[in-house]
């Protein structure tokens, strides 16, 4: 995939499309390799050198992609124009389904779920009979720290999410409501998603 990277590096959109289309498979392969290596390889054995070489190749590619991403991010800003931002995800995709009479909605709020892991989870959900499970890439709120990322998935985040600096830390708030804990975030969901 490294040799194809230059073909998809001209813009942020091209790089994102490359990741969504095929580059994510490299992350999946690395995750699966590490799981297998942990189970099978003798750290001092004959395969240790090959495992180290595979890890170095993955790291080189990841570093190249990250460098390109950061350069494009500095030029283009974030979130990418014309793409779904996490902060708009609830209001655009979840809320309309919640308003449908009789519609059951499962909302999974999972911290640090990489795209390639969602694809694997999606495959399992569909295989388990949940044919309505959907894949809709959405782009994280920066900075990608847990409190900010999880707050960005709440109802109204696209319009009301703010980042406050408190005690030398970034603290998310929806309007005036500071959100520093799971309990506070769940209270927002309960208040805004309660059936009439």
Write out the residue ranges for each language-model feature.
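…; additionally, a secondary subgroup of soluble metalloenzymes is captured
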Residues: 1-105, 112-196
């Amino acid at each position: 995939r490294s040799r194809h990277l230059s073909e998809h590096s001209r813009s942020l959109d091209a790089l994102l499309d490359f990741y969504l289309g095929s580059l994510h498979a490299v992350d999946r392969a690395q995750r699966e390799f590490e799981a297998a290596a942990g189970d099978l390889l003798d750290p001092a054995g004959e395969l240790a050198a090959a495992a180290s070489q595979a890890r170095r190749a993955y790291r080189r590619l990841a570093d190249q992609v990250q460098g390109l991403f950061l350069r494009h991010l500095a030029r283009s800003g974030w979130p990418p124009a014309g793409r779904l931002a996490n902060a708009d995800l609830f209001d655009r995709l979840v809320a309309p389904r919640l308003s449908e009479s009789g519609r059951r909605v499962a909302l999974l709020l999972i911290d640090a779920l990489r795209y390639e892991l969602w694809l694997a989870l999606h495959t399992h959900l569909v295989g388990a009979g949940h044919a309505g499970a959907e894949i809709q890439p959405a782009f994280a709120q920066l900075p990608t720290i847990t409190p900010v990322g999880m707050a960005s998935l709440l109802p109204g985040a696209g319009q009301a999410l703010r980042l406050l600096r408190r005690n030398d830390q970034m603290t998310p708030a929806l309007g005036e409501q500071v959100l520093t804990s799971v309990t506070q975030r769940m209270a927002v969901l309960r208040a805004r998603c309660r059936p009439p």
